[in-house]
């Protein structure tokens, strides 16, 4: 799995003109991508890492501050630009594989005590945020091996 975490003072996800998820207080926007080798265990470990990552004010974590998270699925995190000018998405897991893992990631965050807002899987989403810092972190679970 890959996540891009952005510290934000506010954020929202809009689908078909309707806000479906938002941060109204400072927190984290988490873009999540899934590949074919990811498992429920991967999702749980990544959720724990994100929840405990000390990147908020005064080197505190979202867990320390009970800061909200806005989780948005994003298969494009697995884009390959190795050949030509058109990205390939072949490393991204297909929807029937990735949607349950993104859901498991969100469910595990909630079980840890996180307030989690989400986008809508597979929808055309408009994501807006005010990046605080800016602070943007990339985590790829393949780097853990």
From Swiss-Prot:
- One GO cellular component term noted in the UniProt record for this chain: cytoplasm
Residues forming the motif Gly-cisPro motif, important for rejection of L-amino acids are 133-134
What biological process terms from GO does the record include? D-amino acid catabolic process
Task: Assign the protein's first listed, main location to one coarse class.
Answer: cytoplasm
E.C. no: 3.1.1.96
Which UniProt keywords are listed? Cytoplasm, Hydrolase, RNA-binding, tRNA-binding
The record's subcellular locations are:
Cytoplasm
The answer to whether UniProt assigns keyword RNA-binding to this entry is yes
GO MF annotations in UniProt: D-tyrosyl-tRNA(Tyr) deacylase activity; Gly-tRNA(Ala) deacylase activity; Ser(Gly)-tRNA(Ala) hydrolase activity; tRNA binding
Q: What class of enzyme is it?
A: hydrolase
The catalytic activity, as recorded, is: glycyl-tRNA(Ala) + H2O = tRNA(Ala) + glycine + H(+); a D-aminoacyl-tRNA + H2O = a tRNA + a D-alpha-amino acid + H(+)
Q: List the disulfide bonds.
A: none
| InterPro entries named in the record | Daa-tRNA_deacyls_DTD, DTD-like_sf
* Family matches, as Pfam families: Tyr_Deacylase
Known partners and oligomeric status: Homodimer.
**Entry's free-text remark on domains:** A Gly-cisPro motif from one monomer fits into the active site of the other monomer to allow specific chiral rejection of L-amino acids.
| Family from the record | Belongs to the DTD family.
User: Tell me, what does this protein do in biology?
Assistant: An aminoacyl-tRNA editing enzyme that deacylates mischarged D-aminoacyl-tRNAs. Also deacylates mischarged glycyl-tRNA(Ala), protecting cells against glycine mischarging by AlaRS. Acts via tRNA-based rather than protein-based catalysis; rejects L-amino acids rather than detecting D-amino acids in the active site. By recycling D-aminoacyl-tRNA to D-amino acids and free tRNA molecules, this enzyme counteracts the toxicity associated with the formation of D-aminoacyl-tRNA entities in vivo and helps enforce protein L-homochirality.
* Protein name per UniProt: D-aminoacyl-tRNA deacylase
User: What taxonomic ancestry is recorded?
Assistant: Bacteria, Bacillati, Actinomycetota, Actinomycetes, Propionibacteriales
- Gene label: dtd
């Amino acid at each position: 799995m890959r996540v891009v975490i952005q510290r934000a003072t506010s954020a929202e996800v809009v689908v078909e003109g309707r806000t479906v998820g938002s941060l109204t207080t400072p927190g984290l926007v988490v873009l999540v991508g899934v590949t074919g080798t990811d498992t429920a265990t991967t999702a749980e470990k990544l959720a724990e890492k994100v929840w405990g990552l000390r990147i908020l004010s005064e080197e505190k974590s979202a867990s320390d501050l009970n800061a909200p998270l806005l989780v948005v699925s994003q298969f494009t995190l697995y884009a390959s630009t190795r050949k030509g000018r058109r990205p390939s998405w072949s490393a991204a897991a297909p929807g029937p594989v990735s949607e349950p893992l993104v859901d498991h990631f969100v469910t595990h965050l909630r079980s840890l005590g996180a307030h989690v807002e989400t986008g809508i899987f597979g929808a055309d989403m408009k994501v807006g945020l005010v990046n605080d810092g800016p602070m943007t972190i990339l985590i790829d679970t393949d780097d853990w091996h």
